[in-house]
C-alpha cells in the first residue's frame, strides 16, 4: 500500500517538475464550498477584493446580484453536505456487500449538486494570477509581494495573453500525461479505488484481468517561455 502510494506521488512529481523548475504558474479561483481565505473574489462590506487585493466598491446592482449569490451559495452548501453524506454511507455499505461493484457504480453515476453561477463582477480576468520569478501579474497589473508596481503595456498584455494560451495547452498535456501514467500503474478507476479502500471484489478483479490498457502516443508540448516583466537578482 505504502509502495503504491509512493509510486503515485513520484510519478506526479516527475511529470510536474518542468513547471516548477520554470518558476511560473497560473492560479484562478472563486471559493464556494471551501473553508475561506483570500483566494478568488472576496466581498467585505460591499468592497470587492481579488486574491487579497482591493479592486473597488460594488455598485447597487452588483450588491443585489451578490445577495442572490449568497442565498444560492448557502443552498448549494447544504445540498453538497447531504450528497457527500449519502456517498459516505454508500461506500460503507459497498465495502460490506457482495454487490459492492453495483453499489459503487450507482454512487458514481449520481452527480453532485452544481455550485451557483459566479457573479458577473468576478471574472477570470479579475482573479487569474500569473506567478513569475520575482513578481506576480493580476488583471494586467504587476505586483511585487503585495506592492503594486504598474500596469502592463499594450504589448505586454498581448504577450501575457499568448503565454496564457500556451500554458493552458501545456497544462492539459501535463494532466493527460499524468493520467496515462496512473492508468499504466493502477489500471482503470475502479482498480485504483479498490487499492485505497481495501475493497476486493471478485467481479471487478476478473474484469480488470481481461482489460488491456491501450498505449497512446502524444506529441510533446513544451512549457512556454516566461515573460520578462521583472528580473530577479540572485
Curated annotation (Swiss-Prot):
Residue ranges, compositional bias (Low complexity): 211-220
Gene3D superfamilies for this protein: Pepsin inhibitor-3 (3.30.1120.50)
Keyword Disulfide bond recorded: yes
Main location: secreted
GO molecular function, one term: aspartic-type endopeptidase inhibitor activity
Signal peptide as annotated in the record: 1-17
GO CC terms, sorted: extracellular region
Compartments, as annotated in UniProt: Secreted
Domain of life of the native organism: Eukaryota
Alphabetized CDD domains for the sequence: API3 (cd00225)
Disulphide bridges: 135-230
Region (Disordered): 204-234
UniProt KW Disulfide bond keyword: yes
PANTHER family per record: PROTEIN CBG07421-RELATED, PROTEIN CBG13105
Function description: Aspartyl protease inhibitor.
Similarity-based family: Belongs to the protease inhibitor I33 family.
Protein name: Filarial antigen Av33
